[in-house]
């Protein structure tokens, strides 16, 4: 009798519409309960039984109940699941499989089975890729997943690499394919094989894409020729190899090995500017005045070169610092090093006054054994030879940016617009509290940005610099010429790494059109999105593998008194993050390790400080001594505490 009663239906509808609801993201805790975070200020408690219906990170709508003045959330509708495709470790019990997602806040095993077409016989400990198929908020009884790909077995020494690449859906190996002969591009190549071109790289580098040659002109000015490997001489636009490179967008450099953008036959051999091998190249010739200014008369041309020496960064740096047993093999090579050094100093000086120079940070190199074990982590400071190459590449990229802008009006540009205009007033207010007065309008111009950066670089510590970083916009890849505030340059277009960057291959094709005086179409916008997304994934993969290797390396230091110097890089409500100076590892110091009485402790992300009883005890950029309290291998996290 009540079944089709319209009054009852109306009443139900009314009750439903009057019941308070909230949309937010589920945050799990290790205690079984959770919270529905609606925004930075508001969250609702989710009791343990209700947490069984959801997963950490799910975006949901929940009904809000109030009982004895206490509010709680009952999950009702799934807006967006946190897990769709994921990696995890397989568990097997009584012929039933389940998978535990590889995520610090997801501890529960999800029942699963091998998807159709997956041949592997899964067993305990295997790593796999899975896809969620069922969710309790979608009317299913429980969570359920399909295993769509076998990654590797539990004891594989190379788990960090294979699991990380699978997580980010990145390629594991070099692309297939060969290039049999050079294309006829209708380009006249200047024969520069007699000139003393040299490459300067790490000892282990095989994919050498830049060679340098310098000479002094009669009037004392220096002429620099930058010759760059020429993969577009082998790879036709739209070909299978070109499309594979377009998808990869970059060579993926991970600790221990790389996954190239091009087949190794090209990247490490046919295109690589190997010593004493004749190679096609795209070249740029520029004239540099004594004060480092680049003359407007910039020439781009196709060439054939033969590198006369594969030089190594440390050898060249030691030799220039008069601290070397190594010697250049002849006077011609020695003269090249001296001239390139002069160019480096004058260009560095010019950039110091007219653009911006980055502070040198060391690169950290993992020394790995045969089985992927970490033998050592070496901090490699950026020395004078690194700077010679860096200054030459920046000069060459600046030349390409100008030529592409003036001749075509487009290219693949690296664009950075400095501060987000919406943040300009807040930025000026923050700087004022630290005694720096800037005009909110002026700081949005390239000149104003450079002026502020120079003032910040002159500060006794990097504390203020770290505070304003959050106001900066991100660098972007654009087909439209635009300034690069981070470098302090009016425009910047890279073409010096075409073996490892697809955007540089595009710029090569554009520069060749300029050389031939031909019209060419503007690159499609979607390619810049693909490159930005791939760059993001490659960086995450490098970080993830690094975290795993750092955890392995520091595992035996946990609970010992071994002290490490560490720079504070971030403060949050829960504690602070530090970077170990000697090896680059990131560790977390929980608030209770900073001070036992919670009420006397204030950790402020806003100010980048930790106060105890009202006194600032720690701040971002401080370097302190720490010991390793714990290494959690399952989450690859390192917990440190201030050294006593």
From Swiss-Prot:
It is an enzyme of class 3 (hydrolase). GO terms for molecular function: exoribonuclease II activity; RNA binding. Signal peptide: none annotated. One of its GO terms (cellular component) is cytosol. It catalyses: Exonucleolytic cleavage in the 3'- to 5'-direction to yield nucleoside 5'-phosphates. SMART domains: CSP (SM00357), RNB (SM00955). It holds the Pfam family RNB. Residues 561-643 form the S1 motif domain. Its EC number is 3.1.13.1. Keywords: Cytoplasm, Exonuclease, Hydrolase, Nuclease, RNA-binding. Residues 189-516 form the RNB domain. It comes from the Bacteria. It is found in: Cytoplasm. One of its GO terms (biological process) is mRNA catabolic process. Its main location: cytoplasm. Belongs to the RNR ribonuclease family. RNase II subfamily. NCBIfam families: 3_prime_RNase, PRK05054.1, RNase_B. Involved in mRNA degradation. Hydrolyzes single-stranded polyribonucleotides processively in the 3' to 5' direction. HAMAP family: RNase_II. This is Exoribonuclease 2.
């Amino acid at each position: 009798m009540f079944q089709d009663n319209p009054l009852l239906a109306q009443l139900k509808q009314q009750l439903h519409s009057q019941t308070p609801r909230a949309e937010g993201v589920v945050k799990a805790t290790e205690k079984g309960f959770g919270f529905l975070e609606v925004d930075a200020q508001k969250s609702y408690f989710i009791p343990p039984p209700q947490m069984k219906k959801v997963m950490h990170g799910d975006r949901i709508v929940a009904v809000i109940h109030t009982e004895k003045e206490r509010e709680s959330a009952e999950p009702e509708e799934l807006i967006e699941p946190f897990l769709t495709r994921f990696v995890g470790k397989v568990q097997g019990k009584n012929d039933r499989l389940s998978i535990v997602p590889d995520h610090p806040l997801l501890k529960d095993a999800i029942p699963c089975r091998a998807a159709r077409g997956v041949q592997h016989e899964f067993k305990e400990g295997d790593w796999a890729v899975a896809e969620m198929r069922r969710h309790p908020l979608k009317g299913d009884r429980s969570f359920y997943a399909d295993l769509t790909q076998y990654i590797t077995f539990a004891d594989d020494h190379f788990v960090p690499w294979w699991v990380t690449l699978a997580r980010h859906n990145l390629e594991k190996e070099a692309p297939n394919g060969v290039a049999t002969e050079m294309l006829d591009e209708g380009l006249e190549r200047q024969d520069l094989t007699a000139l003393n071109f040299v490459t300067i790289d790490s000892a282990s580098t095989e994919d050498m894409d830049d060679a340098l040659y310098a000479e002094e002109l009669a009037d004392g000015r220096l002429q620099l020729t930058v010759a760059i490997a020429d993969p577009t001489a082998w790879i036709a636009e739209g070909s299978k190899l070109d499309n594979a490179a377009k998808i990869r967008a970059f060579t993926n450099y991970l600790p221990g090995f790389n996954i190239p953008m091009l087949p190794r036959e090209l990247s490490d051999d046919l295109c690589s500017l190997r010593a004493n091998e004749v190679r096609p190249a795209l070249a740029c010739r520029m004239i540099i005045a004594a004060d480092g200014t680049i003359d407007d008369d910039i020439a781009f041309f196709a060439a054939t070169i033969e590198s006369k020496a594969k030089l190594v960064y440390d050898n060249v740096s030691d030799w220039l610092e008069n601290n070397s047993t190594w010697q250049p093999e002849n006077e011609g090579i020695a003269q090249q090093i001296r001239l390139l050094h002069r160019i480096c100093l004058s260009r560095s000086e010019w950039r110091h006054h007219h653009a911006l120079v980055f502070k040198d940070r060391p690169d950290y190199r993992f020394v790995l054994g045969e089985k992927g074990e970490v033998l050592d982590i070496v901090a490699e400071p950026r020395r004078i030879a690194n700077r010679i190459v860096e200054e030459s590449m920046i000069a060459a990229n600046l030349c390409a940016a100008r030529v592409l802008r003036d001749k075509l009006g487009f290219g693949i540009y690296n664009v950075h617009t400095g501060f987000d205009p919406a943040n300009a007033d807040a930025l000026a207010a923050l700087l004022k509290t630290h005694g720096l007065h800037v005009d909110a309008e002026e700081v949005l111009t390239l000149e104003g940005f450079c002026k502020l950066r120079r003032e910040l670089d002159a500060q006794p510590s990097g504390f203020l610099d770290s505070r304003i970083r959050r106001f900066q916009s991100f660098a972007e890849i654009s087909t439209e010429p635009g300034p690069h505030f981070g470098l302090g340059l009016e425009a910047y277009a890279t073409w010096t790494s075409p073996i490892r960057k697809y955007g540089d291959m595009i710029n090569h094709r554009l520069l060749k059109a300029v050389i031939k005086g031909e019209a060419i179409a503007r690159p499609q916008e979607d390619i810049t999105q693909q490159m930005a997304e791939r760059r993001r994934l490659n960086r995450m993969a490098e970080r993830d593998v690094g975290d795993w290797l750092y955890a392995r390396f520091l595992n035996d230091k946990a609970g010992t008194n071994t002290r490490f110097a560490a720079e504070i890089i971030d403060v949050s409500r829960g504690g602070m993050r530090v970077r170990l100076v000697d090896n680059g590892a990131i560790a977390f110091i929980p608030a209770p390790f900073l001070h036992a009485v919670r009420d006397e402790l204030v950790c402020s992300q806003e100010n980048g400080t930790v106060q105890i009883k009202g006194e600032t005890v720690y701040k971002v950029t401080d370097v302190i001594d720490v010991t390793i309290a714990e290494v959690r291998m399952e989450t690859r996290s390192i917990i440190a505490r201030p050294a006593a």
